[in-house]
């Protein structure tokens, strides 16, 4: 901002950034960037992420030199992202026509390990080793939706406000 504008501009004059609510912002040069107050408050992206982790470990001494260990871990998560760009904005998405998008992801993973560990002293020689395996499972589901062609109603961020039919996609991935 300091580089692109002269000293005659007082940034405080642009704090009240609406000329016409939800349609036109107050700014000196609308050709390639927006009022910084407007960008900070109106061109938004948000992300909410929740995760729960769990872990369980058990071991059993089979003999003085042989031990079995079992481990299991799991996590479950959800994430919601939302992007909003007002009608008339040079910044963000939507090419001055407005834009709204949301994305929801959810998934979980489970990891199970089994380890058989041996440690044996025979005379002056010490032998140790282990044998183990793991089973892993992961699943992720994603729902994504966005407006197309802009927003019909300025300031109303909903797929119902899409000029053209909203674009949606759903995907699911799982593997072991």
Task: Go through each PLM region and give its residues.
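Outer-membrane beta-barrel strand-turn architecture
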Residues: 60-64, 120-123
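Surface-exposed loop/interface segments of Gram-negative outer-membrane beta-barrel transport/assembly proteins
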Residues: 1-51, 69-175
């Amino acid at each position: 901002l300091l580089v692109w504008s002269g000293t005659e501009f007082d940034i405080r004059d642009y704090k009240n950034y609406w000329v016409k609510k939800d349609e036109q912002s107050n700014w000196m040069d609308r050709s390639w960037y927006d009022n910084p107050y407007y960008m900070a408050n109106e061109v938004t992206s948000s992300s909410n992420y929740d995760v729960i982790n769990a872990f369980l470990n058990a071991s059993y001494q089979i003999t003085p030199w042989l031990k079995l260990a079992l481990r299991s871990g799991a996590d479950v998560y959800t994430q919601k992202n939302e992007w909003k760009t007002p009608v008339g904005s040079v910044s963000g998405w939507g090419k001055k026509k407005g834009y709204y998008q949301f994305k929801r992801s959810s998934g979980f993973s489970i990891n199970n390990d089994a380890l058989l560990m041996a440690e044996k002293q025979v005379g002056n020689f010490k032998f140790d080793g282990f044998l183990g395996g793991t089973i892993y499972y992961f699943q992720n589901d994603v729902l994504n939706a966005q407006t197309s062609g802009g927003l019909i109603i300025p300031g109303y961020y909903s797929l119902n406000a899409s000029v053209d039919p909203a674009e949606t996609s759903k995907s699911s991935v799982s593997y072991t």
